[in-house]
Amino acid sequence: MILKVLFDKVASLIGLIVLSPILVIVALLIKVKMPGPILFCQKRVGQHGKLFTVYKFRSMTVKHEASMASKDSEATSIASTEQSRITPLGEKLRRYKLDELPELWNVLKGDMSFVGPRPDVPGYADQLQGDERDILKLKPGITGPASLKYRNEEEILSSVSNPIKYNDEVIFPDKVRLNLYYLHHYSFRKDIQMIVCTVLGKKMDYAGEQI
């Protein structure tokens, strides 16, 4: 995966430079419209199970972001379905994935890759058993097959009566399946395709289905 590592370093550096005006504008908007810290920082499980700090633009109220950031192994990976916790600006940032732009710094540092499993909190990563733990051989990614398939995860969870149960029994196992497929059928060409589909909001054929 030498090509993947090289691409991550070069593309993340270029991305940070090219997108710096947008990063500054978003940071200023958050500072003006959402009093409090600009960034949301949280410990996530990285490659080989090593914890690292992920950086995102803050999209929730200060009280809830602080609660999320301080959660330990009992935290969940479930996207919040309580829209009252997300600010109007935060909702727009999430809709266009602008809240994830600071993760380019994580990619440049080597904590993450452009494509891979989403970095999970310890509570859910600890549920991986047996061969499932092979997923931890990968660097977590900004996007990936599971991210593409569940790009509307918040909407899905808000439509079911028991979001936690649905996530535990349906979404989480399916994400594990897709991430294992990604590990065992790695393709740099597919990486590029997934990045393009993420940016353009398009679907693609992967692992015998449309994601």
Where are these regions (language model features)?
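A hydrophobic, helix-centered structural microdomain
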Residues: 1-64, 182-211
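Juxtamembrane loop-helix boundary motifs flanking transmembrane segments in multi-pass membrane proteins
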Residues: 1-2, 77, 81-85, 100, ...
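N-terminal alpha-helical segment
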Residues: 9, 85, 174-176
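Short, glycine-rich, amphipathic interfacial segments at transmembrane boundaries or analogous
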Residues: 40-85, 146-172
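Short acidic-aromatic low-complexity motifs
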Residues: 94-103
